[in-house]
Amino acid sequence: SKGLMRAHFSEVKKQKEKLKTIISAQTKNRHLGLIRIEFSRFAHRLMDWDNHCASFKHVGDSLKDCGVIIDDNPKIVTQFVPYQFQIKMAEQEYMIIKITDVE
């Protein structure tokens, strides 16, 4: 990944469209209130925590665009918990996003 600051707007658009396609295919859930998000990344190389958290930017925007969450701001996302796990094969990288409604 080229990172958030270095990505050309057309590349960002492609990344978000791909994420929205994946999200739309995997869930029809809607979270209409306060939420907790657990963001787990399984990758060959671990990131610094600031980069790992920043890598959620396009995911959060796509979740909002797909209507899964109403917003990705701190008034709605009351808890954001990042996890990362190192795996052996770069070809098998994936992420898991767990969204829990908060009362």
Show which residues each predicted segment covers.
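Catalytic phosphate/metal-binding cores of nucleic-acid and nucleotide-processing enzymes, i.e., regions
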Residues: S1-E103
